[in-house]
């Protein structure tokens, strides 16, 4: 998925 935050797993 395309998350807004870079600290979360894809």
UniProtKB/Swiss-Prot annotation:
Name the family. Belongs to the bradykinin-potentiating peptide family.
User: Its domain of life?
Assistant: Eukaryota
Coiled-coil stretches? none
Keywords for this protein: Hypotensive agent, Metalloenzyme inhibitor, Metalloprotease inhibitor, Protease inhibitor, Pyrrolidone carboxylic acid, Secreted, Toxin
Positions where Pyrrolidone carboxylic acid occurs in the chain: 1
Q: Name one GO biological process term.
A: regulation of blood pressure
- Tissue note: Expressed by the venom gland.
> Mainly localized where?
secreted
Q: What is this protein called?
A: Bradykinin-potentiating peptide 10e
């Amino acid at each position: 998925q395309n998350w807004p935050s870079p600290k979360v797993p894809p």
